[in-house]
């Protein structure tokens, strides 16, 4: 069923483009917006535009940060262990590990994984930026890279590729322990399981 209002249909169509949002959920979101005062809709629109205008990727770790805060707060923090870098697929995965409160090192966000079937190769994710962290002058002395990628075929392929690049540089390469279900996404794994996976990481 489609509504007689073209403006409402357009709003529903835009909501339906969001990840994990089907048409029914999009309809509920659209109806919620219509019920709320105009000021609420304006605040939502302003927040969306502000995020698009002011959120950037950290030039070092590729995590999200604000304009004017680059490198990001994690990269510049003196409280972090600069000898360890945890490589994750997305900023959401990084946040999942931060919520455990267990890991105290640095991060690198790939923004994807190698997936030949989808036409995604090493040049399409932040591999080059990762390697630069070990080859640039005055780079911190990193002794370990933890590969914390989702336990999927693509994640395993990416982990294998990265280990082959990093080992010749004399870097100790590990990956989080098994115990996370195959095919699961790290953002949905509970904090205790993620902590155990980090503690029990194994050599690649």
Curated annotation (Swiss-Prot):
Zinc finger residue ranges, C4-type: 58-75
A Pfam family per the record: RecR_HhH
One annotated GO molecular function: zinc ion binding
One GO BP annotation of this record: DNA repair
SMART domains with a match to the protein in the record: TOPRIM
CDD domains assigned: TOPRIM_recR
Keywords: DNA damage, DNA recombination, DNA repair, Metal-binding, Zinc, Zinc-finger
Domain Toprim: 83-181
PROSITE patterns: TOPRIM
Homology family: Belongs to the RecR family.
Function text: May play a role in DNA repair. It seems to be involved in an RecBC-independent recombinational process of DNA repair. It may act with RecF and RecO.
PANTHER family: RECOMBINATION PROTEIN RECR
NCBIfam families the record matches: recR
Designated name of the protein: Recombination protein RecR
Species per Swiss-Prot/TrEMBL record: Pelodictyon phaeoclathratiforme (strain DSM 5477 / BU-1)
